Amino acid sequence: MKRLKLLPALALIAGLAVSIGTTSAYAQTTLRVFSGGANQRPDLMRKLFDQYQAANPGVKIEIETGGATSELQRQYLSTVLNAKDSAIDIYMIDIVNPAQYFGAGWLEPLNAYVGSPADAMKPYLPVYLQSNVVDGKVAAMPGFADAMFMYYRKDLLEKYKIAEPKTWDELAAASKKIQAGEGNPNLQGLSIQGAPIEGAVCTFLLPYWSQGKEFNDASGKLTLDKTAAVKGLNQWLSMVDAGVIKRNVAEVKTPDTVNEFKAGQVIFAINWGFAWDRFRMDKDSTVQGKVGVMPLPAMAGGKSATCVGGWQWAVSAFSKNKAEAAKLVKFMATPATSKFLAVEGSLLPTIQSVYTDADVVKSVPWFKDAANVVIAGMYTITMPVTTPAAMLIRPVSSISHQSE
């Protein structure tokens, strides 16, 4: 019943977004919000918007959804924003987009509404200061977090008395031991994404970052340590050759990893936070109660590193309702909203204190493990609009061909 108590609290916070004594708050304003696809839980966003509307009777909020993947959403948003379309006031955007979109002149600076970058971003994990502040301007506000996690078959590691691997080499050895013991030719050791999608960029960066290498210099310019990059790719290649990763990895997309792990065909799987509920709650999941979460292994002599993602709220530079839109964005970035999304939808908080909230811990126990991964994963990818994603994706997508 505690979940139901969150809504009145949110309604109170939503009401505080209206400035006392202003008449404009009671003039009918319609805000149109793009709130992503199914994985971004537009159903929960609708509940939050309803609370905001109840506390702000002069505001009506309409939702637009679309795009099953961040790539499809990015294609759509780029088309709309490039056309300077004012039909949508607020956008939910991926963590890699604020710098791109702000640099293109598509996003409204929020400093006048949320304060200085230091003040606005103080409650949030440091990665969101890095991704949402561009040239001293607040380009977007954090909505909810995401990160790549290492999911694993807890029952199989217990069966073979194997501890959580700390390095990729240890994971490969553990996989081979379990594969041999199970005698199932269809059992994969590790599932990663190698198809030409954003996940392949993270696949490339995980062993690269683990070696202590950065992808951006202090000015934001793309840099690449070729020796570390080759070493990381060779790590994946060796696991393909050993039969730990399947040979057609260049075809594997995010849903493929989820579905194969659910079907009991994978021992270790790298995927985003949303996958946890899929493994735990989907009716066709064969691994319910058998899944563990651990930090991603490191390269030998390196450190664990993960790809932190998440979704941000931004105001369109072409909106005709910027002030009202900014008020709604501010509400959607509050700790109370973050708590609601965590309890109701298992969406990872962008605010560290929410991870230890008693209601959150009770409702989503696995967050106690997730917190360490997200907090430690202070990395993100910042690329200008013109950077070809293929520059990063191609090396990963070619792994299976190199192993033939």
Question: What is the meaning of each model-derived region?
Answer:
Residues 31-47, 66-70, 146, 198, ...:
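Extracytoplasmic "Venus flytrap"
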Residues 95-147, 163, 172, 183, ...:
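Hinge/lid segment of periplasmic solute-binding proteins
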Residues 174-179, 219-250, 296:
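Glycine-centered hinge/linker elements that transmit conformational signals in sensory
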Residues 28-38, 59-64, 89-90, 139, ...:
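Short, well-ordered beta-strand elements
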Residues 39-60, 393:
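Short, polar/charged alpha-helical segment
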Residues 60, 158, 180, 241, ...:
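Conserved C-terminal helix/tail region of periplasmic/extracytoplasmic solute-binding proteins
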Residues 50-127, 133, 155-166, 259-260, ...:
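Extracytoplasmic "Venus flytrap"/periplasmic binding protein-like
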